[in-house]
Amino acid sequence: NQPGPPGPPGPPGSAGEPGPGGRPGFPGTPGMQGPQGERGLPGEXGERGLPGPPGPQGESRTGPPGSTGSRGPPGPPGRPGDSGIR
């Protein structure tokens, strides 16, 4: 008795299950800095200050006495005397 011929090949197998997901990617680089903001508005004006205190009272001082005046010029010559003869 001889063995018969081999049978036909079987059907292909079913698709396998999907593999596990990959690892998460690296974090991205930070973005560039934004442009500079606009200049702010000027501040409001301050209030006017209070008036200052009054100044100290001045001192009254008497001046020194004046210097002695210079000597006056000599007087005019006297009148001539009466003659004793009458």
UniProtKB/Swiss-Prot annotation:
Subcellular location: Secreted, Extracellular space, Extracellular matrix
Key words of the record: Cell adhesion, Collagen, Disulfide bond, Extracellular matrix, Hydroxylation, Repeat, Secreted
Cellular component terms per the entry's GO annotation: collagen trimer; extracellular region
Sequence ranges of Pro residues compositional bias: 1-12
Pfam families with a match to the protein in the record: Collagen
The keyword Disulfide bond is annotated on this UniProt entry: yes
Compositionally biased residues, Gly residues: 16-25
Residue ranges with Low complexity bias: 35-50, 57-71
BP GO terms, sorted: cell adhesion
Domain of life: Eukaryota
PTM characteristics: The triple-helical tail is stabilized by disulfide bonds at each end. Prolines at the third position of the tripeptide repeating unit (G-X-Y) are hydroxylated in some or all of the chains.
Modified residues (Hydroxyproline): 6, 9, 12, 18, 24, 27, 30, 42, 51, 54, 65, 74, 77, 80
Subunit structure: Trimer of identical chains each containing 190 kDa of non-triple-helical sequences.
Family stated for the protein in its record: Belongs to the fibril-associated collagens with interrupted helices (FACIT) family.
Cited function: Type XII collagen interacts with type I collagen-containing fibrils, the COL1 domain could be associated with the surface of the fibrils, and the COL2 and NC3 domains may be localized in the perifibrillar matrix.
Protein name: Collagen alpha-1(XII) chain
Organism: Bos taurus
The organism's taxonomic lineage, starting at the top: Eukaryota, Metazoa, Chordata, Craniata, Vertebrata
